[in-house]
């Protein structure tokens, strides 16, 4: 049976259809916002998965190019692996939903959001979060807390709910807020140095606007939601929990109070070995339960240490940042390098400058077609002292790379100011918490070292949270290390400059964040960020005055768009000859802006000279140094500009009478000529006699 429900959000219709499509899924809905439509299917396994200690939720965000009326590029002509944007959107759906499933739920759950129609005014990624929550709430899967998502823009001093395509272009803020009725579940933001109080007000605005969508979901559930199944929740048997606690709690507490990371890990390894030795014969089939009990006790100790004892595992104050180290210019042949160290977290970022033609072309459903600034993040196993095969970037690496990219994007100079493609690669050399924000700092150092005139230096910091079980007690921590991230309840990453925030990403393991926590985290991050920026400025106070000698040399020139065909030539003949002769790369925009780049500056100068010659107009009355290309009985043909030839009649070759043209000039001679006329057919008439006369008069005057 087909059910529909509809509401109005920000002046546009939001509609859900349930029961019409995907009849064999637990729940399948078609959710639309304007003309953007998402098909969402959710399913769960009948039984919990055995032998695991985590919740096996998978979220897939599937882009279909037919949704924007495109046929995929390439030979195969069908969608391939998910784009980076699709991976990021899948992560954004997962993060607010995961903490709201029942604790101990071990059934496999899959959420598939397929983008089937896109209207640029209504972003599919925002609708997909709402659709995933709606489908889960309507299904029989034990998910009962609706989550809503909105985007908030900022034009002038006015917040805009779900801005249109045009409004997004004008907006200085791109903020996504996900919330339940009571608390904020997730924040994603990018902005043009947004002040802290403005960002907090924008988050409040987004939270309030989420309530209408939550109400819409609740109405749909009350009208046609399925009855919820009673889940089989995993719980560590009391007997095992008590036995492990009695045997190991004191040892765990003592080990977790060791401030040195390596000593603490060694002590915990010893404790775990003793636990295994004690219980592996008694409970051979429950070793995962024993591991879970140990984890719970470790978390209990850390929570007590922070909330009751007022101590952090490494002895720092709650608002204290670890020791900072900054260095530039490490690698001799790269265009720019930055090494950033914070405690045991260390990231080396390398900047590479390329020609404008090396931009990344994006073949997706978004409005963005290309990128000239990109950031890639690598997290090898050795960064945590482990051994595992090296593979391509996973979802986490792609997410962290995009986060650091967003943090610096508003600070990158325009194409006109700095005609280069910019690629940053952050290599995580050592990881003990907040490598994504360390890569923001490393990126700033690398850009400054590469001579990129960024607007201002940026830095990032990760704030953490520890709460009591009932959420009545909470403490915000500055610069969380690995242990605090692992056992903590929040990862609140903030990057920005002295002027304001450029990016935020917030994940939580609990059922949302209070207004106070958000306020304390944002202002705590500012204090830490300013301290880190001071360290960066001590290392390199401003961008290098010149780019590296190993970076390509570039030049730009503006030509008449009508002359583009003259530079390209028939079948690319002219431009290919320029490239072959000078060894440059040439990129021509539709508005006539030409970028020329090469490893050698001489090649750039030569190519620019040729292009200027090809596009320059011959003007009547001007004097040119031309080259004789052909001789006839009646005169000499002279090339005054590339592909621009005129005739010097025999009577205009010299002041005296000329019997034979060859008596005055030969093919290949360079002579001064004056343009006396350009006739109605575009033919150029030249005079050597007039040019000589003018030159003599100038000499007399001098």
Swiss-Prot record:
Required cofactor names: Mg(2+)
EC nos: 2.7.7.8
Broad class of the protein's primary localization: cytoplasm
BP GO terms, sorted: mRNA catabolic process; RNA processing
Record domain S1 motif: where: 621-689
Subcellular location: Cytoplasm
GO molecular function: 3'-5'-RNA exonuclease activity; magnesium ion binding; polyribonucleotide nucleotidyltransferase activity; RNA binding
Signal peptide range: none
Keywords: Cytoplasm, Magnesium, Metal-binding, Nucleotidyltransferase, RNA-binding, Transferase
Gene Ontology, cellular component aspect: cytosol
Cited Gene3D superfamilies: GHMP Kinase, N-terminal domain (3.30.230.70), K Homology domain, type 1 (3.30.1370.10), Nucleic acid-binding proteins (2.40.50.140)
Ranges where the KH domain occurs: 552-611
Group of enzyme by EC: transferase
Pfam families recorded: KH_1, PNPase, RNase_PH, RNase_PH_C, S1
CDD domains, alphabetized: KH-I_PNPase (cd02393), RNase_PH_PNPase_1 (cd11363), RNase_PH_PNPase_2 (cd11364), S1_PNPase (cd04472)
SMART domains the record matches: KH (SM00322), S1 (SM00316)
Catalytic activity: RNA(n+1) + phosphate = RNA(n) + a ribonucleoside 5'-diphosphate
Keyword Metal-binding listed: yes
Function: Involved in mRNA degradation. Catalyzes the phosphorolysis of single-stranded polyribonucleotides processively in the 3'- to 5'-direction.
Entries under NCBIfam families matching the protein: polynuc_phos, PRK11824.1
Family: Belongs to the polyribonucleotide nucleotidyltransferase family.
Identification of the protein by name: Polyribonucleotide nucleotidyltransferase
Source organism (scientific name): Clostridium perfringens (strain SM101 / Type A)
Lineage: Bacteria, Bacillati, Bacillota, Clostridia, Eubacteriales
